[in-house]
Structures are given as C-alpha cells and as structure tokens.
Amino acid sequence: MKVFCEVLEELYKKVLLGATLENDSHDYIFYLNPAVSDQDCSTATSLEWANTCGIQGRHQPISVGVAPIAVAPVCLKTNSQMSGSREVMLLQLTVIKVMTTRILSVKTEFHAKEQYRDVIKILLESAKVDSKLICMFQNSDKLLSHMAAQCLALLLYFQLREKITLSNSWIAFCQKNLSEYSESNKAIYCLWTLTAIIKEIFKDSCSQKTEILKQFLTHFDTIFEVFYNSLFSQHFENCRDTSKIVNILMCFLDLLELLIASRIHLKLHFTCQRILFLKPSCMLEVITWPIQAFVKRKVIIFLKKCLLCKVGEDLCRGSVPALMPPDHHVAVDMLALANAVLQAVNSGLLKTLSVYEKHSFFGGDEVQPECELITSPDHVILRAASLVIMKSLEIKFQNYSSASEVKVDLQRFMSELLTFLKPHLQPSLQLHNPCKWLSRVFIEQDDDMLEAAKASLGIYLTLTRGCEATESLTQGKEMWDHHTHENGYNPHCIFLFFLKNIGFDSTVLLDFLISSETCFLEYFVRYLKLLQKDWDNFFTICNNFDATESKYDISICGCVPSLVQDQSSNQTIPHRLTAPHSHRDVCARHSWASDAPSEPLKAVMSKGAHTMCASSLSSPRASQSLVDYDSSDDSDVESTEQCLANSKQTSLHQQATKEIQDAAGTSRDKKEFSLEPPSRPLVLKEFDTAFSFDCEVAPNDVVSEVGIFYRIVKCFQELQDAICRLQKKNLFPYNPTALLKLLKYIEVISNKTMNTL
C-alpha cells in the first residue's frame, strides 16, 4: 500500500511538471486503473482488485526507488491518510486528468507528450477505463462523481482529437438514457458530459474544431431531438420530482446554448443545433410553468443571448470564436424565434411573468412578523424581457414589406411592453417622456442598454424607410412624430436620455468606442447618420427637453451646474435656444411636451442655492482620463484612407468603419472636414471654463443653467478632440477617420444653427 501511494504521488508530480517518464508506459497502468467492479459499479474496499480489474499477468508494479522531485508544494495527503480506496481513486483520477490536459497542451515537451499519449491509449484500449468512469460518475460520492465526469469528458475529447473511435459504451449509455428520459435518472450525467466536451472543443486552439464537432454531433443528432420533445412535453405541475426536472432543465440550457453557439460560429447545421428555432414554443412555455423564478430568469436570459447572437460567451473559459459573416440559414432561424416570441407576447406571456424576486435571509427563508418585508422587482428579468421583445421586433420588421403593417404591430407590442413595465417604473412614465423607459430599465446594465437602443434605432430606421417609400416627406409628419414618442422609440429622445445618464461625459463615449465590444460603435454611427438628416427635429426635441424639465423643476443632470463667467468677456450664453423657422412649428407636435411652458430657461441663483452638478460640461471623469489629451501635439491632417500603425482591426471594426466611410464621404468639401480640432465660435468662453466639483459657489454668485443642446455639442466636441489626439499617437484601436468626419459635419451644422439664432 505504501509503495503504491508513493508511486502515484511521484507520478503526479512528474505529470504536473510535464516531465518525461522513466519507465515503460505499460508499467503505469497498474497504478492508474481505477478499482471498479464491472458487475455492480461499486467501489472496491481494498487494493485486491489488482488481479481482477487491473492489467493481469505481464505488467507488475514498478520497483520504485523514488527520487525526490523539486516542485511547488502540493496538497497531497500522507500515506496513512490515503489508506482508503476513495483517496486512492481521487488521486488516480487527478493524475489521469492532468496527464490528458498535458497531452492537449501545446506547451508540453514532445517526448513527454508521446509518453502520456501511450499511457492514456492503453488505459482506454486495454483497461476499458471509460466504462469504469461511466460507473463512477453515478456514484453517490459527489466529489468522486465530479472527478470521474471531468476525466471522462477529457478522455472523450482526447479520442476526438486523436481520431480514435469514440467510446461505444458511452455512446450507448447516452442514447439509452436520453431516449428514456422520463424513466431514467441518469440523463443529467449525459448532459453534463456533452456540455463539458463541447466546452473543450471551444477552448482548444486547434484549427479542426468544425471537423471535430461534426464527428461528435453525428452520434447524437437524432436522439437529441427525442430528448427535447420528451423534456418539454411533460406537465410540470403534475410531476412528483420537480427538483429532477429543474436540475435537468438548467443543465440542458447550458448544453443548448453551446450547441447554438457552435452553429453560429462554426457553421454547422445539425438538427440538434437548430432544435430551439424549429420548436421555439416549447421553450417559451417554460416561462408559464409554475416553476422557480430563477429558472424562468435563466430561460429569458438564454433567449436574449440567442437573439443577440451572444450565446456561449459565459460558458466557455476560452475565447469564443470571432463572429462569422451573416448566414442566411441563421437569419431564417432567428426570424422564426422572433416570430414565436412576439406570438407568445400577443397571447399574454407578459401577463403571466412575475418579476418580483423572493428575498433571501440569513438563517432561514422567512421574515419575522415584526420585520417589514419590502418587495422590489427583479430588474434582471425586466431588462431581459424588454430586450427580447425589442430585438424580436427589430428582426421581424426587417422582413416586412408594408410600412402600415409595421406601424400597427409596433404600436401593439410597444403598448404591451410599456404596460408591463409601468407598475415597476416609479414615477410613472406618463409624467414625462415615454421614451425614458429604456434608460430607466437599463440604467444598471450599459451593454444591454446599448443593445436596446440599437434595436430601437433599427426599428425606427426600418419604419422610416417604409414610410418614405409610400408617402411624401411632409405627409403625415405630425402623426409620425406623435407615434414615435407615444410608443417610446424616438431615437433622439433615447439618445438624449442616454447622454444624461452618463452626465454628458465624452470620456464615457470614448471608453465605449475603444471597447472590444462594437455595439456602441455601430449604434453611434447609425445615429450620427440619422442626425445629419433629421437635425431640425433633434434641435426641437432639445428645446422640448429644456421646457419640460423647467416645468417639472427637474435639472438636466439631477442638480444645477454652475458656469463660471469669464470676467474678461461680456458675452453670455443664451438661456433658451430658439429654433429656426424650419422647425419652430414642430414643438407642439410632441404630446409629452405639449403643455410645457414656452418661457426661456433662466436661472440666476444666489450663493449656496444649489450644489454643483458632478456631471456638468467638464466632467470629473475627464480629469481622470487614461490619456493626457492636452499634452498631445497637433500634427498634419491625415488622409481618409490612412490606417493606424500597429493597430489590430477586427472584422467587425472594419465593417463598421466602412459603413461610416460610405456615409460620411458623400459630397463633402475636403477643407470643411479637416480633422484638426478647429476653432469653435459655438461654444463661448464662459462655456469652456472648467467647473468646480467640490460644491463651491461660482464667483460673483452667478450660477447659470445651460440647455441640453449646449451640453451635447460640448460633449461631441470633446469626443472629437480626444479621438484626434489618440489617432495622432497611434493609440486608437481602429481607423477613426470616417467617424471623425461624421462628428465634424455635426459640428458644422451646429454652427449653422447657432448663426440663425
């Protein structure tokens, strides 16, 4: 026993270091072959299994003269503690797991890797270790079961990588238990192992992932559909063992997410990868089951990931493969899922969705009678459900041919969504702009907020194109403006609320633009293109924001910012922006601001009347910038086609950059779009003065309130300057030249607007 444990410990240390083995590969099989009886899969109580389950006859234990190996301390039990068969098995499984991992690693030395490969092949072929591991992961000992499942998953992936015939015993085990799900308690073991293998495929850096996955899924394509139908056809309320269904459903969602991710990223089209899109109503019905809230939450989040094509990101330890170009088959499936979601919403799905989360308590799950229980909505479900509906609408409307049908459906579903959200958003949206729902629902999750804003903008643009194709530019304009506000998807309002949420801070926009996520870049580009065409409407909405907030005594950013007046200048900032004649008459069209006062926004406040706003024009975040923009020297104007040196451009960045190049490069005067930071008469000297953030009162006791239009223009100017300076230092991750052209054009039309005032 002592010698046996010493050999295992020494072998573990060698494999951990990736060192070569001194003995023949067959000599190690005796020590690595688990003590499991083939008859009853029970764990042996001693090491007497060597003559029955081990390799008999020829390969006897190695004569060990153990030499110490210098390694980092490892948590190995002493020989006396390892006397039990359980501890021996755990160490055996650990060695097998580490050895297999070493084989799959590119860092392992070639000779050592070949030795490890021989050992594992012998274990699989002669010792039938895969069959024993199948028995072991059904063990009541949870640790032993988990280790056995991990080892089995790695060994199966090893077989796939080495193009060895996949374990017949495991294939038979999975097919039997998945097809007999209702009678079997072992389906969860199959699901867990399948999930672990696909994770290994994603995690591996080899170039044959698609071929490996294709070989793997071939064995389970048919049986997986049978299991899917069986799982969702049962009536949950009539089941006795609900915990079994919950466990299997949670594990199944992880597996299904990886299958869909592999379908999107690796371009395979097995039925098991498409089953959700072929039968989406089955999954949606889970939300109506009398099941725990966390299960419904997982289902809704799963649907959100599918519609956003972000499946698999949280489950794969390694990086998910780069998103492939659009696939017609995937687009068709996404449309089927979107239609199913909207059909369920139309049938009253949101009315059955409870969003109040159950509170957890230390020491129990019930609140004491003397304690007050305050319930609050589950904002995770609110966000996920809202985004699922918005994305489904965007996908569905992309395939519509009639603008009138889009209008009718949009009004119906947005009414359903706003009615669903209304009880959970206080104060009520009716007091303010209905478009505010998006910023309030997603205030704690900026990535979901950007996805929702992008989807909303996509819906607006789709509907706009449809209306322009069937109506004149002026026909029905008033009704159109009213429709966008009433149904909460006006793109200008949504963008203004977004800027308010971030305090008009250009550094936040810069962070989003240089992020590895491209959602904001795509959204921002599309919005700037819209802004060029719809400037008058945007300007009017800015005025309406100021008027509405003045009526309800709501500051733009929660408190009134102070402007330090430049004593050397007699210029003052207009307190109210008067729209040019081309868009003055639009003000009254917006029902949410129709009763707003028309008086100018004026505020001259005494000392100490208001605290200083932390999100004023010169944001505190700007002083904490990663790059000292003011230290950058100006350089020559760069050409539109110039790429940044030493910068890595992803395919998505390139695609978005090309889009803005096409949009911004149309008939613009080259001199007008000079990329050098220009002198800007629009922002007056007082406006450009730095603010105080320690709640001090401005000199001369003058505190002025500035309209939202000025804040937006200032934010865009700061963003443009920051991008220019980063570009000159080759610090921007992609070529921003076309983006700068869009920002420059916005500045030009801003100046023209100011000149008309």
Swiss-Prot record:
Disease tied to this entry: Intellectual developmental disorder, autosomal recessive 27: A disorder characterized by significantly below average general intellectual functioning associated with impairments in adaptive behavior and manifested during the developmental period.
Result after altering E313K: In MRT27; uncertain significance
Tissue expression as described in the entry: Expressed in adult testis, prostate, prostate, spleen, thymus, skeletal muscle, fetal kidney and brain.
Database matches in InterPro entries: Lines_C, LINES_N, Protein_Lines
Modification sites for Phosphoserine: S635
Any one GO BP annotation for this protein: cognition
Keyword hit for Phosphoprotein: yes
Family from the record: Belongs to the protein lines family.
Keywords recorded for this protein, A-Z: Disease variant, Intellectual disability, Phosphoprotein
Species this protein is from: Homo sapiens
The name this protein goes by in its record: Protein Lines homolog 1
